Regions:
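Transmembrane signal-anchor hairpin modules in multi-pass inner-membrane enzymes, especially those
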Residues: 1-108, 118, 122, 142-152, ...
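Alpha-helical transmembrane segments of multi-pass inner-membrane proteins
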Residues: 10-19, 64-69, 100-112, 128-136, ...
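Long extracytoplasmic/lumenal interhelical loops at the membrane interface
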Residues: 175-176, 181-183, 273-275, 283-345, ...
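Membrane helix-loop boundary segments at the extracytoplasmic
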Residues: 32-42, 342-345, 379-422
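A membrane-periplasm/extracellular boundary helix in multi-pass inner-membrane enzymes
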Residues: 70-75, 163, 225-230, 247-289, ...
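Membrane-interface catalytic loops of GT-C/OST-like multi-pass glycosylation enzymes that act
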Residues: 118, 122, 231-234, 332-336, ...
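Hydrophobic transmembrane alpha-helices and their immediate junctions
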Residues: 255, 260, 345-394, 417, ...
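Membrane-interface micro-motifs in multi-pass membrane enzymes
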Residues: 2, 51-60, 122-123, 182-195, ...
Length: 455
């Protein structure tokens, strides 16, 4: 019953809250559902004859959020918490916004040009959902407080996923992800959700104050254990490599170094012989059939993209032909986010995707550079959210080399947070910049007050 109560309360907050308070609440609940996937984990829970798995919770929240955003930005209706714009104005569209729009347009073009539109249709629908909510989010997220709201809600969902994975294992020895996947994601996709939550937890701890901040650190060991239980070598390796970036971005490096030592010991304790064997087989490419299969599909993807460089074979059409190109079994996926994009939608799509990711990281760098001279608490919090989002994205980008996750919503959530963070910091910097001085007068230095960003 408690699961149904949770769903009804969040549904009310996401729908009515979008109109009464702010569309930020609807967006946050929509993204919570995207990460939590309640129809999967609670599919058999019901109350008064109504099962959680029978309702389209995300659809109701999405429609309410889109409607409230349209009415608000069209000037027809203003929810109470967004009746006035921020003091620095609405964040402008940046290069990253336009690159994402270009990527969206090109991916959409590869649906009507697909070899099989029937095959492409369900995956195209998933793209439309992701793109629509991403674009909607760029109009909704206007303050740092908005970004933190989404950040914490999504992080809570990811931590709960880790809790469920651990609960299934501890109560019955069942490896949920390895046996069943997670709500349409295979073990690799679900493991990345949990792995991306690790740097998010650390930088949430760094940004917070009070005793409850330690709950973020306490959540990390169960998350690590959940990643191990996934048997996803891609997620394990991505998290290990991202640890270096987390260390570079951390403010208290000595404390983090101690945490790394403790974490290393915990991983050795938590990882059984099967997990250790699974992880260390990454380096045994000559005997690892999985790695050899990936190498083969990568070569196939390059051939496909070279033959159809503009539009590719069509969204998710490459799986239909990998066997004809020499894959070991029919329907074999490419197992690389980047090469899958090239095979399905052409080299142009991959170029736009790469440019967008590059612009995103440049934007995060510029945001940190603006804030670097300032040590007030609000500026440090903004630096923390930038670091948390950046490290989560680095982890995804590493994992995407060997995993095919083009409809994976978690990175798109991080992307929109990164894009809007850069837009907000640019808007603040522009507003606080001193006016241009007359030619005969020296320009007076301006005082940047980044702490105001949080309002």
């Amino acid at each position: 019953m408690k699961q149904m109560v949770f769903m009804l309360v969040t549904l009310l907050l996401g729908t009515a809250g979008s109109f009464a308070l702010s569309p930020v609440y609807g967006l946050s609940i929509y993204y919570l559902y995207a990460v939590l996937r309640p129809q999967f984990i609670w599919e058999h829970h019901e109350f008064a004859g109504m099962a959680i798995g029978d309702m389209q919770w995300s659809l109701y929240v999405a429609l309410a959020t889109l409607a409230a955003t349209f009415l608000w930005r069209a000037g027809l209706f203003a929810p109470s918490k967004v009746s006035a714009p921020p003091w620095y104005g609405n964040p402008p569209f940046t290069r990253s916004h336009y690159l994402f729009m270009a990527f969206t347009a090109w991916i959409s073009l590869t649906f009507p040009t697909a070899v099989s539109t029937d095959r492409a249709w369900p995956f195209f629908v998933e793209y439309v959902k992701i793109f629509t909510m991403f674009i909607c989010a760029t109009f909704i997220l206007r303050t740092i407080r908005d970004l933190w709201t989404v950040y914490f809600v999504v992080l809570g969902g990811a931590v709960y996923v880790g809790y469920e994975i651990n609960t299934y294992y501890l109560n019955g020895g069942w490896l949920l992800l390895a046996s069943r996947g997670y709500g349409g994601l295979d073990n690799n996709g679900a493991a990345l959700i949990v792995a991306m939550a690790v740097p998010m937890c650390y930088f949430a701890w760094e940004a917070s104050s009070g005793w409850w901040r330690w709950l973020f650190l306490l959540a990390i060991p169960p998350l690590l254990h959940a990643v191990l239980l996934s048997y996803s070598r891609g997620a394990m390796a991505s998290l290990g490599l991202t640890a270096f970036v987390i260390f570079l971005r951390a403010r208290n490096k000595k404390f983090l170094g101690v945490c790394y030592l403790i974490g290393f010991v915990l991983v050795l304790i938590m990882a059984g012989p099967e997990i250790r064997e699974r992880f260390f087989s990454i380096g045994k490419a000559d005997v690892d059939e999985s790695f050899q299969s990936r190498q083969n599909t990568w070569a196939i993807a390059i051939r496909m993209a070279n033959e159809r460089p503009l539009f590719g074979l069509g969204i998710r059409n490459s799986n239909l032909f990998t066997y004809d190109y020499g894959a070991d079994i029919p329907g074999r996926s490419i197992h690389s986010q980047y090469l899958q994009t090239a095979a399905d939608s052409g080299w142009v799509a991959l170029l736009l995707y790469g440019l967008f990711l590059g612009s995103l990281f440049v934007g995060l760098y510029r945001s940190r550079r603006i804030l670097r001279p300032y040590t007030d608490p609000e500026s440090l919090k903004v630096q923390s959210i930038a670091s948390g989002v950046e490290c989560a994205m680095v982890l995804f980008c590493i994992g995407a080399f060997a995993l095919s996750l083009e409809h994976f919503e978690m990175p798109y959530i991080m992307m929109v947070l990164a894009v809007q963070l850069n837009a907000i910091t640019r808007a603040v910097a522009t507003r606080l910049a001193p006016p241009a001085a007359a030619p005969s007068q020296p320009a007076m230095p301006g005082t940047f007050r980044p702490g105001i960003v949080a309002s």
